[in-house]
């Protein structure tokens, strides 16, 4: 490792590796990525089951090591059956691939992830769903959503109004949708409908994309842009618009990005915490790292920070930022939490239902907000091994749950257990042999599973710091004009960062107009 670089990037997640790979490959810059953990990937942590537990990036993990990897991405196990020691000892995870929290890429092989990987010559197949179904909790009926068909779980009036509003969303341009960036989707809904059925269904639909249960906390522009670009991309939830990854899981995205980065001369330091960004005369000029031999300074012309906003003040002293910005980050920004369930099954139970086995399944309002939750609790669930058979061993199947709660709710054990219990009861009502078909279950929570979000009315911190020269940000929580969420948002943020840091218009170079 040298003493000076063109660019130092803090964090080896998807955003940091994207910025590094493209600066190295296209701009021939000397770039160093520094990662405090012992592995690349950030929140893309993925596991492949073996005869004695799981492996992560080829390394077999003990239970404490598995829990440490989870902890590195703010995730922890809340329920396992049988318990983790028995799961490990019996080799129940052998042949399964899963993540530290449910992952999917929006638009699959046409998404931003695919665009960047293809740009770098590192294509990855991301097969996705084929179909979308809604399950009515009042009578447990399953409804395959058909293009142009009536929404039979809604009243005739609500179905008609819902379709009218969906047409309005999908006919917007990105510029028109951007007018709603600073209001909540709850406000947008209240301004467009007085029908509670319509409100609840569209709120649940939005939760698929935004992983937020309360529309009043959801930026309207982010969701409306998802809807606005569907026709240009030629994909939607009905035809298939989400991608999954086979072994070794979504961490393979990071592996491919890191490969492109290293092939272009980039360097990665693992297991090395950055303790401070060096700032002189309000200019970032390098970083201080902690090595086994003590602190060390590394100079850089530019610094890119991918640490989430709520953690930056550990390496960027507050004194360099306006007090309002510091207060907002500390007190008003919040974490979109994710409760994830992974279930190993003996048979393909979804074939019992009259829906496409590769459908995304939406269960709206399983628990009402009036029962003590910040928003209605909706369930997104699917058989991921039907999307990609390699996610489960031959003859077995992997069922996944994604449930949105806030960061504070994730730390309320009573609420988390209530949601898991209700989800389990729902499955038993719909599949009487649910327990007999199940070989194992694993539930995890993360209080930052879908990133850090600003309060309604505020934009995310932009990719170029306005107060410290030569300091840039990237990651799913950055970019005043990036939109979307999760991995695709991290990639968008990275491309926007490259627009400011590099010498080219990378947004136009890499992304189709509908992704900008």
Spans of features found by a protein language model:
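Helical element adjacent to the flavin cofactor pocket in flavoenzyme catalytic cores
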Residues: 231-296
